[in-house]
């Protein structure tokens, strides 16, 4: 008996909708990363993009535990002298909640070219409405 190897044509992609209202940022990001990579499937293969599409709604209503709103910092640098910028998580959640969720999920995805393909299947929206409601095989996840 030979070992079954997954081919790119064998992969079937579903759509998962995750409602982030009232849920913790890390919990939502971990669930999204699991579905994006395909680790929930019995045919998981590390060298192929076998994951599903993930839609995260209500990004504005996400919560964090502890004092992270005031203490967790996000850093960036423009590359120019004096171009170092830092922002608190609380400020970013008010202005760019989509970036916060995408950044958290990106940290849980492999850092290679396959990771870029995987991350392209993530869709994040501030409100409850999203344009992917008509996709076939939409699976609603609520934890």
From Swiss-Prot:
One of its GO terms (cellular component) is cytosolic large ribosomal subunit. This protein is one of the early assembly proteins of the 50S ribosomal subunit, although it is not seen to bind rRNA by itself. It is important during the early stages of 50S assembly. Gene3D superfamilies: Ribosomal protein L13. Belongs to the universal ribosomal protein uL13 family. Keywords: Ribonucleoprotein, Ribosomal protein. Signal peptide: none annotated. It comes from Dehalococcoides mccartyi (strain CBDB1). The keyword Secreted does not apply. PANTHER family: LARGE RIBOSOMAL SUBUNIT PROTEIN UL13M, RIBOSOMAL PROTEIN L13. Part of the 50S ribosomal subunit. GO terms for molecular function: mRNA binding; structural constituent of ribosome. SUPFAM superfamilies: Ribosomal protein L13. Pfam families: Ribosomal_L13. PROSITE patterns: RIBOSOMAL_L13. The gene is rplM. This is Large ribosomal subunit protein uL13. One of its GO terms (biological process) is translation. Disulfide bonds: none annotated.
């Amino acid at each position: 008996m030979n070992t079954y190897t997954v081919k790119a044509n064998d992969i079937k992609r579903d759509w998962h909708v995750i409602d982030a209202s009232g849920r913790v940022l890390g919990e939502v990001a971990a669930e999204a990363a699991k579905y994006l990579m395909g680790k929930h499937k019995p045919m998981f293969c590390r060298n192929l993009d076998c994951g599903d599409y993930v839609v995260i709604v209500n990004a504005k209503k996400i919560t964090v535990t502890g004092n992270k709103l005031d203490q967790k910092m996000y850093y960036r640098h423009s590359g120019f002298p004096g171009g170092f910028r830092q922002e608190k998580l609380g400020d970013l959640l008010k202005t760019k909640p989509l970036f916060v969720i995408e950044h958290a999920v990106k940290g849980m995805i492999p850092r290679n070219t396959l990771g870029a393909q995987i991350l392209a299947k993530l869709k994040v929206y501030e409100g409850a409405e999203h344009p992917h409601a008509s996709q076939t095989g939409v699976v609603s996840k609520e934890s």
